[in-house]
Amino acid sequence: MSGHNKWANIKHRKAAQDAKKSKIFTKLIREIIVAAKEGGGDPETNPRLRAVLERARAANMPKDTIEKSIKKGTGELEGVDYQEIIYEAYAPAGVALYIYAMTDNKNRTAQELRHLLSKHGGSLAESGSVAWLFERKGIIEIPKEKIADFEEFAMVAIDAGAEDIIEDDPIQVITAPDMLTEVKDKLAENGFEGEAKVTFIPKNTVKVTGADAEKVLKLVSVLEDNDDVQEVYANFEIDDKELEEIMSKLEG
């Protein structure tokens, strides 16, 4: 599954490069509002809020923007009521897409996604037809240079409750969703600070190459550029070299 992990890492790198762009802030603000609405405004008692605040600070979001977003979520300030919605879809070559959105208008979002999918060779799928292909997991990403002794790191991660460790850059620690905060904190106590989030990992992947690979990546890219879309999960597999070439072309 290295081609899939490489794609996730390229997206991670691109997000870091794009951190000052307003689109990244727009998505993070929505996440903060929804997390605060769901679990309250105190990150000490709201793991979901704590995780998104760490990402917001890493993206250099102003403190004032963060505080206002939290207050909009808790109701202390007036704000937009966002709903979390999953859209299931197919890309070219039978690749499954699990699209996580936050929207204040479900009809608008569905219409926009239907248009983007149709334009790029994809289609919306019936509810439940794609969900079973993905597994909800926690993931902690730690830059490789922060880990001097991988064996020591792996022992700490496994003892803390990690299910799997993917030796890439960044190093990825996979956990059960309800163990994410506990494992992250245990790693941090031992000097291994990382960024944590809940994600959806494909159970199996579909190998795509050539024109199909380019079409799939282009579709995922335009979907993620939509303001209502927070994340697109996909079950494709593309060779690392080809993936890098296509992503460079799309980014250029």
From Swiss-Prot:
<dbReference type="InterPro" id="IPR002876">
    <property type="entry name" value="Transcrip_reg_TACO1-like"/>
</dbReference>
<keyword id="KW-0963">Cytoplasm</keyword>
<dbReference type="InterPro" id="IPR048300">
    <property type="entry name" value="TACO1_YebC-like_2nd/3rd_dom"/>
</dbReference>
<dbReference type="GO" id="GO:0006355">
    <property type="term" value="P:regulation of DNA-templated transcription"/>
</dbReference>
<dbReference type="InterPro" id="IPR026564">
    <property type="entry name" value="Transcrip_reg_TACO1-like_dom3"/>
</dbReference>
<keyword id="KW-0805">Transcription regulation</keyword>
<keyword id="KW-0238">DNA-binding</keyword>
<dbReference type="GO" id="GO:0003677">
    <property type="term" value="F:DNA binding"/>
</dbReference>
<dbReference type="InterPro" id="IPR017856">
    <property type="entry name" value="Integrase-like_N"/>
</dbReference>
<dbReference type="GO" id="GO:0005829">
    <property type="term" value="C:cytosol"/>
</dbReference>
<dbReference type="InterPro" id="IPR049083">
    <property type="entry name" value="TACO1_YebC_N"/>
</dbReference>
<dbReference type="Pfam" id="PF01709">
    <property type="entry name" value="Transcrip_reg"/>
</dbReference>
<dbReference type="Pfam" id="PF20772">
    <property type="entry name" value="TACO1_YebC_N"/>
</dbReference>
<keyword id="KW-0804">Transcription</keyword>
<protein>
    <recommendedName>
        <fullName>Probable transcriptional regulatory protein THA_1246</fullName>
    </recommendedName>
</protein>
<dbReference type="InterPro" id="IPR029072">
    <property type="entry name" value="YebC-like"/>
</dbReference>
<comment type="similarity">
    <text>Belongs to the TACO1 family.</text>
</comment>
